[in-house]
Design a protein with these regions (language model features):
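Primarily secretory-pathway and cell-envelope proteins
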Residues: 1-78, 117-155
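Short secondary-structure capping micro-motifs at structural edges
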Residues: 23-27, 84-85, 99-101
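Multi-bladed beta-propeller domains
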Residues: 95-102, 136-138
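Short, surface-exposed loop/turn motifs with a glycine/proline- and acidic-biased composition
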Residues: 102-109
Length: 155
């Protein structure tokens, strides 16, 4: 079992495609493979939520005029791309719940994620080489503000 620490970040609504940027360094690395989570909080006895989410925490790259992509000072953004989790009580302890993907066969691709539980974010990294472009965003500065798109090529 690996303990996840809460992030000090305000979570955006899940309908917002890209959150404000964070520069919090990666903390916890979990092995690639099936995952489930256990949450312990005393108030879960009386107020456990019905669901939770895993959301992608994408690394942000700048889009320069050249084809090369430069990473933007280790900036990360929470995406709206998510996996829904079920919340079920742990029979041995009423203060604990187990969080599992709706699809029991789901294996997360390598990259950084945020577990969203009770409006709190907990980040972790699934070990391995990132191959899913959803984990990389290009940021282009425009007169109307920054625009984000998935990276055409992974850095």
């Amino acid at each position: 079992m690996i303990r996840l620490e809460p992030m000090n970040i305000r979570l955006p609504d899940s309908r917002i495609a890209v959150s404000v940027l964070t520069t919090k360094p990666r903390t916890v690395v979990v092995p690639h493979g099936p995952l489930s989570f256990v949450a312990y909080q005393r108030e879960l006895m009386t107020s456990a939520p019905d669901n939770a989410q895993l959301r992608i925490l994408a690394q942000v790259a700048r889009t320069p005029s050249s084809p090369a992509v430069a990473m933007a000072n280790d900036a990360w953004a929470i995406r709206s791309v998510s996996v829904d989790l079920t919340v079920a009580p742990v029979p041995e302890s009423r203060e604990m719940v187990e969080l599992q993907p709706l699809n029991p066969d789901l294996v997360l691709s390598p990259g950084r994620y945020v577990l969203v539980f009770k409006n709190q974010a907990y980040d972790f990294v699934v070990a391995g080489k990132v191959t899913d472009r959803a984990h990389c965003l290009e940021r282009a500065e425009t007169p109307d503000g920054d625009r984000f798109t998935e990276c055409r090529n992974l850095p």
